[in-house]
């Protein structure tokens, strides 16, 4: 039976997530966490502007978190209902369209990941500490939010936890205040951020600088001390990656970049805004995960600064990050992007060709074929435009839509300005059909910029 608060889905890929009637501009989270009992208490302030007059509003929020009080614009809500992963609240008075909507939620509970078709995502208890890995819909496991990637906002996150632990969140560390046996860490992420990219990392970590002092982009490692030697070897070339990607993609979009390595093993690394999280198994002292180091760094441009408006366009994140792996290989003395692209195409040709990359469906949106064929789409475009125009396009793409939401149509439209020949056919066969196209020959006819 549908709840009386049911509304038509924002996104068919995640019909339970996202909310109507307002746009969030800021989150202020005050959190307290006890690692021994995995107990989280929080106060969340959500600042928004209404888009229409309506009697009630909803937020995404896990049922593992118990709500004790809700305020709307400083007054108690007439009532609130927390069910089926939604917190529905009714203000005492209707708010006009364009009016300020400030929601304060007090809550506590034992957070746990959200189960979905892609496994468990969100808050995860570690052997000692916790991590948050929310893609695509796990943010509601630890705070009430408008959990859809098109909803980007600034964040202030305060986290109080036991003093032996280091607590990391997105953005700049504003303060670190020890008190008795606990420490409060306060972080500010001024750049707009999608809810799934917000993160908390808590563990027995130490913070180290990565690279030389005075690097254009400050980089740090937050890692268990026992992994320092392996990390220094495995991530030694990250400053070179940063320099390369800044040259090819445009300026790094945030103030700094931090890599976390957990003391636990992780199946795959995880991107967050300004942060990437790796497992201890990715830090082997043999650079066995270097392509993933490049992949996660590239997500700071493609996924974090430029964030999809709808999940069907996931190739705009993963195809670009996968292609960045090939760009790094090419620049660092490994196989060229063309060699890797042709090898990837040969491998894809042996697999089922039953996915449309531009709309793969929710079940397959994290399928490796989306990643690889997305990267192949970019390589086909690069062969069509040649290097100079291709990388000029990428830099304009990241500059024009910096800290914004994006669609495939916007990228296709922008790319069209870089070629006298129509490009829609290229995008149509690579993104809009199931059969795997052939790559153009290396060194084929280049088209001229029309601008």
Q: Can you name each region flagged by the protein language model?
A:
Residues 45-65, 143-147, 155-162, 409:
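Surface-exposed beta-strand/loop patches in extracellular or lumenal glycoproteins
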């Amino acid at each position: 039976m549908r709840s009386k608060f049911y509304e038509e889905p924002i996104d068919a890929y995640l019909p339970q997530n996202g909310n109507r009637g307002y746009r969030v501009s800021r989150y202020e989270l005050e959190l307290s966490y006890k690692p021994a009992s995995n107990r989280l208490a929080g106060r969340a302030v959500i600042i928004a502007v209404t888009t229409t007059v309506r009697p009630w509003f909803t937020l995404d929020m896990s049922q593992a978190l118990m709500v004790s009080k809700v305020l709307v614009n400083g007054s108690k809500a007439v009532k609130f209902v927390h069910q089926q992963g939604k917190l529905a609240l009714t203000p005492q008075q209707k708010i006009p369209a364009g009016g300020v909507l400030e929601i304060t939620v007090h809550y506590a509970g034992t957070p746990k990941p959200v189960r979905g078709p892609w496994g468990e995502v969100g808050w995860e208890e570690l052997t000692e500490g916790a991590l948050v890995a929310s893609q695509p819909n796990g943010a509601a496991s630890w705070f009430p939010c408008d959990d859809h990637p098109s909803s980007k906002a600034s964040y202030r996150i305060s986290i109080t936890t036991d003093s032996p632990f280091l607590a990391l969140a997105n953005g700049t560390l504003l303060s670190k205040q020890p008190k008795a046996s606990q420490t409060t860490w306060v972080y500010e992420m001024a750049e707009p951020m999608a809810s799934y990219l917000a993160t908390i990392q808590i563990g027995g970590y130490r913070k180290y600088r990565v690279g030389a002092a005075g690097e254009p982009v400050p980089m740090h490692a937050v890692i268990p001390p026992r992994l320092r030697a392996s990390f220094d070897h495995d991530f030694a070339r990250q400053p070179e990656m940063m320099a390369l990607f800044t040259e090819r993609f445009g300026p790094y979009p945030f103030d700094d970049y931090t890599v976390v390595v957990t003391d636990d093993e992780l199946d795959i690394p995880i991107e967050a805004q300004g942060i990437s999280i790796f497992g201890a198994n990715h830090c082997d002292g043999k650079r066995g995960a270097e392509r993933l180091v490049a992949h996660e760094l590239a997500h700071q441009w493609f996924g974090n600064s430029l964030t999809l408006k709808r999940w069907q366009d996931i190739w705009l994140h993963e195809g670009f990050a996968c292609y960045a792996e090939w760009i790094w290989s090419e620049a660092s003395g490994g196989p060229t992007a063309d060699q890797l692209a042709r090898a990837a195409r040969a491998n894809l040709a042996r697999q089922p060709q039953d996915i449309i990359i531009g709309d793969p469906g929710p079940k397959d949106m994290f399928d490796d074929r989306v990643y690889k064929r997305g990267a192949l789409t970019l390589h086909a475009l690069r062969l069509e435009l040649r290097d100079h125009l291709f990388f000029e396009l990428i830099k304009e793409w990241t500059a024009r839509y910096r800290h914004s939401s994006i669609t495939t149509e916007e990228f296709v439209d922008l790319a069209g300005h870089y070629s006298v020949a129509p490009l829609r056919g290229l995008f149509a066969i690579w993104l809009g059909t199931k059969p795997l196209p052939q790559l153009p020959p290396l060194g084929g006819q280049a088209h001229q910029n029309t601008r």
